[in-house]
Amino acid sequence: MSDQAQTSMNQYLTFTLAGEQYAVEVGKVKEVLEYTSVTKVPRTLEFMRGVINLRGSVVPVIDLRLKFDLGETEKTIDTSIIVMEVEISGETVVLGTLADSVQEVIGMDSSQIEPAPSIGTSIKTDFIQGIGKQEDQFIMILDIDAVFSEAEISVVAEHAEPAR
């Protein structure tokens, strides 16, 4: 068997948070939106910025920078909302995550991805699926299903409609 047949190529959407490169599997991403006004929801988690109306569906919007203790996302011309499907305990929830900017879709095979380090990252490593190497930069590949606890997702899901 050739080396190419043994490595699997995966597609990732890359984006920035606080100057660092992150990525999520394209299969988790439903769409990318320009930043739009977010309706605040009182008495909710600090990192939940509010909800948006997405073609008649209520979608909660999460600030990943706040979740990762990187400070609040500032709205700029590049700020985007990445609409994703997150699965926890067998339930799929659609939510939007704020990104400072969305970069591109890249392909990486398993040889370009190292296991998450236990030190030296600004976020807890159980959120990190691995560290991708693309040319001379590192990209933290998030396991978006592990970013939120079951309790956090249940609070967020109260403001969302079920995934279709």
Regions found by a protein language model. Name each.
Residues 1-164:
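An acidic, low-aromatic, low-complexity terminal/linker signal
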